[in-house]
Curated annotation (Swiss-Prot):
Gene Ontology biological process terms, A to Z: aggrephagy; autophagosome assembly; mitophagy; piecemeal microautophagy of the nucleus; protein processing; protein transport
The keyword Protease is annotated on this UniProt entry: yes
Keywords: Autophagy, Cytoplasm, Hydrolase, Nucleus, Protease, Protein transport, Thiol protease, Transport
Family, similarity comment: Belongs to the peptidase C54 family.
EC number: 3.4.22.-
Gene Ontology MF terms: cysteine-type endopeptidase activity; protein-phosphatidylethanolamide deconjugating activity
Top-level taxon of origin: Eukaryota
Gene Ontology annotations for the cellular component aspect, listed alphabetically: nucleus; phagophore assembly site
Entries under InterPro entries matching the protein: Papain-like_cys_pep_sf, Peptidase_C54, Peptidase_C54_cat
Cellular localization per UniProt: Cytoplasm; Nucleus; Preautophagosomal structure
Protein name: Probable cysteine protease ATG4
């Protein structure tokens, strides 16, 4: 069954095309939505009327778009997995965690990652979808009883929440300890997550994927990629390119929103792992206009396990199973009860039938590895992010190099050069640039010093927005942005570690959305537009 629950009030967009990881979809224009916005009650009533009429399809998004986003693998908080041993220096419980229902009472170890594993889960999702594209192709769509589901299930099994599986949260945490000096229960940033992905893929060759990670200003070196892809053979091994970048100080610079959209529109894209301004990790898989489509890893569910015949248990989990997981977190359980009461009251007022009530019970039973997407305005995205691209062949690599930054060659966030500058030349350039106009930060090279480089993990990337401030790139008009009332300025860089020096020339002007920009939040300002099955 398909669902479209409008829980937000942002403008309906029937003008801009929809992009999802290299695919493009036309918006649906209907008489009901064209030229006007629907409030919450109107959207909810539209869903009820659609169900009573026997039509369970979205009236705002195309069926092909819904099928595409639903086919993306979604990994979220889990509860009840084998304990991850605590460290004596692991984060202690806080009042905030208790109020949010994220209190793990197991004194031996963590049996849930709620509250600290969101970046790990978004990184797992990025990797899982890269593997899905690699082994099943970008055009594959999830269907019940499809023979290809066997391969799909095999990929899911690699992420089951037990230490024996190669990409489990247990092994991500171990990599954090090993290469990033992260303690169990400590939040990962994009850099720590990408290093974990790189090492875990290297330790598990059956995945068929090698990882190229660049944390220095989005630079990619042609010779390094080819050496990694070919090794000692004549066969090109698929490469997952991970680029750690920072596009502003406190928020994404809207001047370069077009470049982020360009990344997501490339056929090699597997998503952008980042955060909603400072606290909530998200995986962006597409966009429409100035709004990004996200997968959210913050709904606790029962731990992924194996069934009687060795298959990963995920799609067949029931509403009761989900409630058992949520029951360990009082606040989540409370909100589930509130949602039930609200839905039942609305449906009784609409004189719905028993079949409609049954349908809504199914709606409440969220799938475990395929989920709805959420819309978020670009300006609410944290500037520190991890961009992923899957390169499957020599031709694919050449195509990616040709198209990345093609729209505006003079302004790029990904820079591809033939070879890396030698260390002596780099040191000469570094020393010759020193002056009062340069923000000088610790520089760390080599994988052995990861722990030193990631003391402040979310801030260890070069701020590329400074490049655009220097060139005086004019801001473009954004839907819902009142340019005349915008007054926020990006401040000079605070003291933080970057991978190389950054020239600071002047402050950067960033348009700011007004309070009533139409984006409401599940928590703050995140819209609740949801699309899925």
């Amino acid at each position: 069954m398909y669902r479209f629950l409008g829980l937000g009030t942002h403008p309906n967009d029937d003008q801009n095309k929809i992009h999802v990881l290299g695919r493009q979809y036309d918006p649906i224009k209907t008489q009901e939505t064209e030229g006007k916005d629907l409030d919450l009650n109107s959207r909810f009533q539209q869903v009820l009327d659609s169900i009573k009429d026997g039509n369970k399809k979205s009236t705002t998004y195309s069926q092909s778009f819904i099928d595409d986003v639903y086919s993306k693998i979604w990994l979220t908080y889990r509860a009840g997995f084998p304990p991850i041993a605590r460290d004596k220096d692991s984060p202690t419980f806080t009042l905030g965690a208790l109020l949010r229902g994220q209190f793990d009472f197991n004194e031996i170890g963590f049996t849930s990652d709620a509250g600290w594993g969101c970046m790990i889960r978004t990184s797992q999702s990025l990797l899982a979808n890269a593997l899905l594209f690699l082994h099943l192709g970008r055009d594959w769509v999830f269907k019940a009883k499809d023979p290809a589901n066997v391969e799909h299930d095999r990929i899911i099994s690699w992420f089951v929440d037990i230490p024996d599986e190669p990409f489990s949260i247990h092994n991500f945490v171990q990599q954090g300890i090993k290469c990033c000096d992260k303690k169990p229960g400590e939040w990962f940033g994009p850099s720590a997550a990408s290093r974990a992905i790189k090492n875990l893929c290297k330790e598990y060759p059956p995945c068929g994927l090698r990882v190229y990670f660049s944390s220095d200003c989005g630079d990619v070196y042609d010779t390094e990629v080819r050496e990694l892809a070919y090794g000692d053979s004549d066969t090109f091994t698929p490469i997952l390119v991970l680029l750690g970048i920072r596009l502003g100080v406190e928020k994404v610079n809207l001047y370069i929103g077009d470049l982020l959209r360009e990344c997501l529109s490339l056929k090699q894209s597997v998503g952008i792992s980042g955060r909603k301004t400072s606290f909530l990790a998200l995986l962006s898989i597409g966009f429409q206009g100035d709004y990004l489509f996200y997968l959210i890893p913050t709904f606790p569910k029962k731990a992924l396990t194996f069934g009687k015949h060795g298959e990963p248990v995920h799609r067949l989990q029931t509403k009761k199973t989900d409630e058992n997981a949520a029951g360990q977190y009082p606040v989540f359980k409370y909100w589930i009860q509130i949602m039930k009461q609200t839905m039942m009251t609305a449906m009784k007022a609409s004189k719905t039938t028993a079949s409609t009530l049954k349908f809504f019970r199914v709606l409440m039973s969220n799938q475990s590895t395929h989920q709805k997407v959420t819309k978020l305005h670009l300006s609410h995205m944290d500037p520190s992010m991890l961009i992923g691209f899957l390169i499957t062949s020599e031709d694919d690599f050449n195509d990616w190099k040709e198209n990345i930054g093609k729209k505006d060659p003079s302004h790029k966030i990904v820079h591809i050069t033939e070879t890396k500058v030698s260390e002596s030349t780099s040191n000469f350039q570094f020393n010759s640039l020193r002056s009062n106009s340069i923000a000088d930060y610790d520089n760390c090279s080599g994988e052995d010093c990861d722990s030193a480089a990631i003391a402040s993990d979310s801030d260890d990337f070069v701020d590329l927005a400074a490049d655009f401030a220097v060139t005086g790139l004019e801001p473009r008009t954004h839907t819902g942005v009142d340019d005349e009332t915008s007054s926020d300025y990006v401040q000079h860089f605070p003291i933080r570690r970057f991978s190389q020096p950054v020239i600071v020339s002047r402050e950067d002007v960033v348009p700011t959305l007004s309070e009533d920009n139409g984006v409401i939040a599940l928590d703050d300002k995140m819209s609740g537009i949801s699309v899925g099955r």
